[in-house]
A protein has these predicted regions:
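Active-site loop of classical SDR/Rossmann-like NAD(P)-dependent oxidoreductases
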Residues: 297-309
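N-terminal Rossmann-like dinucleotide-binding module
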Residues: 1-56
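Beta-loop-alpha module in the N-terminal Rossmann-like domain of NAD(P)-dependent dehydrogenases
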Residues: 45, 56-119
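Hydrophobic residues in well-ordered beta-strands that form the structural core
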Residues: 102, 127-129, 159, 240, ...
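C-terminal helix-rich "cap/oligomerization" subdomain common to oxidoreductases
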Residues: 1-11, 76-81, 283-286, 312-353
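Predominantly a Rossmann-like dinucleotide-binding segment in NAD(P)-dependent oxidoreductases
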Residues: 126, 133-220, 229, 346
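Contiguous beta-strand/loop segments that form the cofactor/metal-binding neighborhood of enzyme cores
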Residues: 2, 196-278, 306-320
Length: 353
C-alpha cells in the first residue's frame, strides 16, 4: 500500500468476498473510485459469481478466499458476506496484514464483534465497518446545519419514522434478502443499528435507552416493529419509530431512498427530511424554507456505499482514522444490545461510558 502522504500513482489493490444482493452496490461503487482496483473476488456459488463477472467485468474468482489472499496479496479486502462468516475471514486477513472493510452486522453477537476488532488491532491493520447510513448526503447536510447553528445552540430532539413495507405477507423478504426470515433478531439488529450509529453521529453520546419491540408478521422469527427512545448526554431526546411490515406513503422502491422521514428540533428552529430527500429549515417564527444541497439516486440510498467506500479509501491513503472504526462501532453495538435488554426487561437501560 502506498505510504501516508505518498505521491505514488499505484492504485490500491482490493479484493471482495461475497456476491449477494447488496454486494452489487459495493462492486459498482468501487469502480468509480480511481485510486482503487478490485483485482479479484471470492464466492462459492458459481451462478452468483457469474453474475458479478458479467456485470462488473471481474474475471478472477476464487472459491477459497484464503487462496485469493495468498495469490493476489491485496492491500485491502471488502467483506460482503453474512455475519457468521466475518470472524474467520477477518482473522485470516488480519494475520496477513490486509486492511479490512467489513459489512454490518459485524458479528452474530457483541462478544464475537469484540474479538474481531481485537484481532485487527493486534495485527495493526486498519479496520472499518461498512456502516453507510451516516454517509447518506442528507445526514451529512443535517450534521453540517446543526454544527452551523441553523437550529440554535441547543439540540432538543430527533425523531425518525420508518415504514419499509417489505415485511408483510407469507413471502416477506424472499425477493431480496430471504435470510432475514430466520434471524432471531431482525429490526434492531439489521436496520435499527444504522440509526443508532446515525443518531450518535448527529447528536453525540447516548446515556440511556428504552425500547419496545414486537413481531407483526408470524412467518418470520425476529422482531419487525419497534419504538426506540434515546437519551443523549447533551440533554436531547431521540426516537426511532419503525416497522418493516406497514408501507410508507410512497412507492416501495422510493422508501429505500431516505428510509423514512426525520424531524430534528433545536432551540431556534427545526429541520425536516422528506421521503424524496428534500430538507427544509424552519426558524422559530419563520416560514419553512428548502435547503439546497446535492443528493442523487445513483447507487444505494443517496449513493452512500460510494461515499462510505470513498471515506475508507481516503483513510487508507492518508492513514487517518475511520469514522466507523471497529472501536467506534463497538459502542454502537453496545447500544444495540441495550435496546434488546430494555425490551426484555420493559424498562430503561443506562449506557455505561
Amino acid at each position: 500500500m502506498p505510504p501516508s502522504g505518498s505521491t505514488s500513482s499505484r492504485k490500491l489493490r482490493g479484493v471482495c468476498i461475497g456476491a449477494g444482493y447488496f454486494s452489487h452496490f459495493q462492486y459498482e461503487a468501487w469502480q468509480r473510485i480511481p485510486e482503487v482496483e478490485i483485482v479479484a473476488f471470492s464466492n462459492r456459488d458459481p451462478v452468483k459469481a457469474a453474475e458479478i463477472t458479467a456485470k462488473f467485468g471481474l474475471t478472477k474468482c476464487y472459491a477459497d478466499y484464503r487462496e485469493m489472499f495468498d495469490t493476489e496479496k491485496p492491500d485491502f479486502v471488502d467483506i460482503i458476506t453474512p455475519p457468521p462468516s466475518h470472524q474467520a475471514i477477518c482473522a485470516e486477513a488480519a494475520k496477513r496484514g490486509i486492511q479490512i472493510i467489513c459489512q454490518k452486522p459485524l458479528g452474530p453477537s457483541l462478544a464475537v464483534a469484540k474479538e474481531i476488532v481485537a484481532d485487527a488491532a493486534r495485527a495493526g491493520v486498519k479496520f472499518m465497518v461498512h456502516e453507510n447510513f451516516r454517509f447518506q448526503p442528507w445526514h451529512r447536510e443535517i450534521k453540517r446545519l446543526i454544527q452551523a447553528g441553523a437550529i440554535g445552540d441547543r439540540l432538543h430532539s430527533l425523531a425518525f419514522r420508518s415504514r419499509m413495507g417489505d415485511g408483510w405477507g407469507e413471502n416477506a423478504y424472499i425477493p431480496r434478502q430471504p435470510y432475514f426470515r430466520d434471524y432471531p433478531r431482525l429490526l434492531v439488529y439489521e436496520t435499527g443499528v444504522h440509526f443508532i450509529d446515525t443518531f450518535r453521529y448527529l447528536a453525540g453520546d447516548i446515556t440511556r435507552v428504552t425500547a419496545w419491540l414486537r413481531r407483526l408478521n408470524p412467518v418470520i422469527k425476529g422482531e419487525d416493529c419497534g419504538l426506540l427512545i434515546f437519551e443523549f448526554a447533551n440533554g436531547a431526546l431521540g426516537q426511532w419509530d419503525a416497522n418493516r411490515y406497514n408501507e410508507p406513503a410512497c412507492p416501495l422502491p422510493e422508501a429505500r431512498y431516505t428510509f423514512g422521514e426525520f424531524l430534528v428540533e433545536g432551540s431556534a428552529g427545526s429541520l425536516r427530511l422528506y421521503l424524496d430527500g428534500r430538507i427544509t429549515l424552519k426558524k422559530l417564527g419563520g416560514e419553512e424554507q428548502t435547503v439546497d444541497y446535492p443528493h442523487g439516486r445513483r447507487g444505494f440510498a443517496g449513493d452512500c456505499c460510494y461515499l462510505a467506500q470513498r471515506h475508507f479509501t481516503d483513510c487508507l491513503l492518508t492513514n487517518q482514522p475511520c469514522e466507523t472504526s471497529g472501536e467506534e462501532y463497538l459502542k454502537t453495538m453496545a447500544i444495540q444490545e441495550a435496546m434488546y435488554a430494555s425490551a426484555s426487561t420493559r424498562g430503561p437501560v443506562d449506557i455505561l461510558p
